[in-house]
From Swiss-Prot:
Organism: Sorex arcticus (Arctic shrew)
Protein name according to UniProt: Cytochrome b
Keywords: Electron transport, Heme, Iron, Membrane, Metal-binding, Mitochondrion, Mitochondrion inner membrane, Respiratory chain, Transmembrane, Transmembrane helix, Transport, Ubiquinone
Annotated residues for binding of heme b b566: H54, H153
Function: Component of the ubiquinol-cytochrome c reductase complex (complex III or cytochrome b-c1 complex) that is part of the mitochondrial respiratory chain. The b-c1 complex mediates electron transfer from ubiquinol to cytochrome c. Contributes to the generation of a proton gradient across the mitochondrial membrane that is then used for ATP synthesis.
Lineage, opening ranks: Eukaryota, Metazoa, Chordata, Craniata, Vertebrata
Predominant location category: mitochondrion
Residues that hold a ubiquinone according to the record: H158
Length: 336
């Protein structure tokens, strides 16, 4: 991502007048520019698929019991989401502009300082030149901060060693990293590369929004403003609350809730490997998140509104109430 981003930055201009045409220029005139651009855009989608799988795996096997590692991971997730959001603004299409307008506007819900904060971030009274330039600057610097944080993430993981599916100590089963893990990892890397190249070479625009092929126009609002697919679940939670501040809080808490998970671990076992009821609830949570993702991409109309509200309630209820209580129930089942 950093490499493709670097090559894109060589040809991109962060000015409202030329940003859109510079992206067009990259796709049409730069050698393999189209490939670099779509690798970068779809690489972000692959990145998020890996992140979601990684977080899900951590939740399933109780890896969140390594507190420092887990909390840096939550911080990393926020940083990657911020980076992806700012990157989406750079092509300066309709969805770039209106996405930036809608999401930055959420900060105005903060009491007292809200409106000042939004104008400070915009660098003016609307999303304009100053906003685009600073987003480019932040989008360039954040990945390096993410890389540093990932290093610290690993540093803390190596304090304890990694977890395993059973949730028991791995010490007796440790083997050399090379050749065993290197070979195992090459398989995963090749499958990811296969998926990414297939996406980039066969349907590069599958996950994008056609509205972003229209240059940004402050006088014309697109009929349905929606973010990229990896933000839709959070967007659905935001929209399910009919109050601005409430929605913003729910949006932030939908990710921040991950930091609370270790303190809600009531089971006497670490992993879900031998806990069938918790397993069921975990997969219900996954289904709920997929439902939220679907709702986030739908218009705010009759059946979708109530489905989104129910899915949002279920999301918080599962994590905060149902799963901890079920864990206690499982403890009693095993007479522990």
């Amino acid at each position: 991502q950093i490499l493709t981003g670097l090559f894109l930055a060589m040809h991109y201009t962060s000015d409202t007048m030329t940003a859109f045409s510079s992206v067009t220029h990259i796709c049409r005139d730069v050698n393999y520019g189209w490939l670099i651009r779509y690798l970068h855009a779809n690489g972000a989608s692959m990145f998020f698929i890996c992140l979601f799988l990684h977080v899900g795996r951590g939740l399933y096997y109780g890896s969140y019991m390594y507190l420092e590692t887990w909390n840096i991971g939550v911080l990393l997730l926020f940083a990657v989401m911020a980076t992806a959001f700012m990157g989406y603004v750079l092509p300066w299409g309709q969805m770039s502009f209106w996405g930036a307008t809608v999401i930055t506007n959420l900060l105005s819900a903060i009491p007292y300082i809200g409106s000042d904060l939004v104008e400070w971030i915009w660098g003016g009274f609307s999303v304009d030149k100053a906003t685009l330039t600073r987003f480019f600057a932040f989008h360039f610097i954040l990945p390096f901060i993410i890389a540093a944080l990932a290093g610290i993430h690993l540093l803390f993981l190596h304090e304890t060693g990694s977890n395993n599916p059973s949730g028991l100590s791995s010490d007796a089963d440790k083997i050399p990293f090379h050749p065993y893990y290197t070979i195992k990892d090459i398989l995963g890397v090749l499958l990811l590369i296969l998926a990414l190249t297939s996406l980039v070479l066969f349907s590069p625009d599958l996950l994008g929004d056609p509205d972003n092929y229209t240059p940004a126009n402050p006088l014309n609002t697109p009929p349905h403003i929606k973010p990229e697919w990896y933000f839709l679940f959070a967007y659905a939670i935001l929209r399910s609350i009919p109050n601005k501040l409430g929605g913003v809080l729910a949006l932030v808490l939908s990710i921040l809730i991950l930091a609370v998970v270790p303190f809600l671990h009531t089971s006497k076992q670490r992993s879900m490997m031998f806990r069938p009821f918790s397993q069921c609830l975990f997969w219900i949570l996954v289904a709920d998140l997929l439902t939220l993702t679907w709702i986030g991409g739908q218009p705010v109309e009759h059946p979708f509104i109530i489905i989104g509200q129910l899915a949002s309630i279920l999301y918080f209820l599962l994590i905060l109430v149902i799963m901890p209580i079920t864990s206690l129930f499982e403890n009693n089942l095993l007479k522990w």
